[in-house]
């Protein structure tokens, strides 16, 4: 469970990362996938992560302290927004590559995918990148409340096929609106952190 959560800092590059040994779970996904809402649902704080009406605007890693230093959630910029300049996309890719490959604190990644849609090329590349570097990853399927049962069963299969899903990974369907499976996400965080 998350009993306490607070924003610590935003970092545009490695020099601004927090230098300690506290474990981190990174959250990443396309712009407007529901990442900020997911953080707010996890922490039971609707004001913690700002929900932007301007997708693709944030180019910073946002660090959140959980349970007074037990671990951190790291909110990565949303990717795949067409109106962002190519130079910013390249800067984002370099920053995330550096973070994912070299960040010793990183224990795993929650990759958020919209259950309503086929994964984009960016989604597929992100998942395969994480697998290539042996970074533990959990797929979080968002916006469950927007689909009927027969739709989300069919769409989960479609998403898994599109990203070439590895069976050893966890795939969980959530709704930020009605908190479906949010408790299960705490279990997956503990699993990534190495807790029993």
UniProtKB/Swiss-Prot annotation:
Source superkingdom: Bacteria
Sequence ranges assigned to domain EngB-type G in this UniProt record: 21-195
One GO CC term, this protein: cytosol
Keyword terms of this UniProt record: Cell cycle, Cell division, GTP-binding, Magnesium, Metal-binding, Nucleotide-binding, Septation
Binding site for GTP: 29-36, 56-60, 75-78, 142-145, 174-176
One of the GO BP terms on file: division septum assembly
UniProt cofactor(s): Mg(2+)
Pfam families: MMR_HSR1
UniProt: Mg(2+) binding residues: 36, 58
Keyword Phosphoprotein (UniProt): no
Matches recorded under Gene3D superfamilies: P-loop containing nucleotide triphosphate hydrolases
GO MF term list: GTP binding; metal ion binding
Similarity comment: family membership: Belongs to the TRAFAC class TrmE-Era-EngA-EngB-Septin-like GTPase superfamily. EngB GTPase family.
HAMAP family noted in UniProt: GTPase_EngB
Its job: Necessary for normal cell division and for the maintenance of normal septation.
Protein name: Probable GTP-binding protein EngB
Origin species: Mycoplasma capricolum subsp. capricolum (strain California kid / ATCC 27343 / NCTC 10154)
